[in-house]
A protein has these predicted regions:
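Pyridoxal 5′-phosphate
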Residues: 1-389
Length: 389
């Protein structure tokens, strides 16, 4: 049996989405900036997709800017806001458990004179709001806290973050790549100025995403050289993928209630099974305020990579963390930030369920996981010493 439990890394393209995309590879191949018929046809398709994305998050169509994905959108916000607001100051604040797209860009900005404050989180992964209040100065130009964490699934109190930032007139960005399509996202309700998203997280194509930019806020251009995306991001529009993103997000929102309920029930069944059948294991992140799909565990006395390899041989596909950094041998910065000891963080696995997973698949995964953990622990000197003591 093959069981795919890595939907936080990526999802397949829904057949309904692919069906909408295919004509734009062939007969509807126009450049959306061309003035002739096939170009106008392409422009209409892009406008429709922009409207679909806007409607999904309660934004205006002219507040949606298509990008190559979530990482590009995150990078754009950090660099663009710092550039456009340099006269005010050179300080930004982000959480200590942001995606690597944010963390790496923030580190790069530090090398170029930007002061970055990293907010602590508690054991559930929730940001320290008191620290945020105290960290804001008259030179702070941006606060960025992800809506939902990509590793442990924790859903952050973004409205509280916005409330604090707005008291001081500071712009707010949220990386909602894991949230959009999975839980309701309303930019007006949240109050954010910027929001990142990526189509391949909600059964759309890879290589396309979007950045919500609230009308009137100051941000620099991402790419110069053309008039695409209202002259903010030059480059020929990725037509078929943009069409696919629009269709995918519309379907995701339409089916969200039903899918979220079923996935949450299945995930809770899985979590209960793991905690009941396997000793020396901890669930990472908050039990309730987490994404429907997410279950992240740390298995003591064994390495996560060994667990993953054994699961893969049995047909179960999961992750040891974010797919963008899964090749690293370093323990997850997110797990360390929530207080997981280094030696235990190394034994962590993220399972992320999708809309097609079944109870039969979860039962199979539980059986395989129990066997794998037992077998690996028998070979672990640390585990054997612990048993003797």
């Amino acid at each position: 049996m093959r069981v795919y439990l890595d939907h936080s890394a990526t999802t397949y393209v829904d057949p309904k989405v692919l069906e909408k995309m295919l004509p734009y590879f062939t007969e509807k191949f126009g450049n959306a900036n061309s003035q002739h018929g096939v170009g106008r046809e392409a422009a209409v398709a892009v406008d429709k997709a922009r409207g679909q994305v806007a409607a999904a998050i309660n934004a205006k169509p002219n507040e949606i800017y298509f990008t190559s994905g979530g990482s590009e959108a995150d990078d754009w916000v950090l660099q663009g806001v710092c550039e456009a607001n340099a006269a005010k100051g050179n300080e930004i604040i982000i959480s200590s458990i942001e995606h690597s797209a944010m963390m790496t860009t923030a580190k790069w900005l530090e090398k170029h004179g930007v002061k970055v404050t990293y907010l602590n989180v508690d054991k559930g992964g929730f940001v320290d709001l008191e620290q945020l209040e105290n960290a804001i100065t008259d030179k702070t130009v941006l606060v960025s806290v992800m809506l939902a964490n990509n590793e442990i699934g924790t859903i952050e109190p973004i409205k509280d973050v916005v409330g604090i930032a707005k008291k001081h007139g500071v712009l707010v960005h949220t990386d909602a790549v894991q949230a959009v399509g999975s839980i309701p996202v309303d930019v007006k309700d949240l109050g954010v100025d910027f929001l990142s998203m990526s189509a391949h997280k909600f059964y759309g194509p890879k290589g396309v995403g979007a950045l919500y930019i609230k009308n009137g806020v100051k941000i620099g251009k991402l790419l110069h050289g053309g008039e695409q995306e209202r002259s903010m991001r030059a480059g020929t529009t990725n037509l078929a993928s943009v069409v696919g993103m629009g269709e995918a997000i519309e379907l995701a929102v339409k089916d969200m209630g039903e899918n979220a309920k079923r996935i949450t029930e299945l995930r809770n069944y899985f979590i209960d099974g793991v905690l009941a059948r396997i000793p020396y294991v901890r669930l990472n992140g908050d039990r309730e305020k987490r994404l429907p799909c997410n279950a992240n565990f740390s298995f003591e006395y064994i390495e996560g990579e060994s667990i993953l390899f054994s699961l893969d041989l049995a047909g179960v596909e999961a992750s040891s963390g974010s797919a963008c950094s899964s090749g690293s041998l370093e323990p997850s910065h997110t797990l360390l930030a929530i207080g997981v000891p280094v030696e235990i963080a190394h034994g962590s696995i993220r399972f992320s369920l999708g809309k097609d997973n079944t109870k039969e698949q979860i039962d199979y995964t539980l059986d395989v996981l129990v066997e794998v953990v037992e077998r690996l622990r028998k070979m672990s000197p640390l585990y054997n010493v612990n048993k003797e003591n």
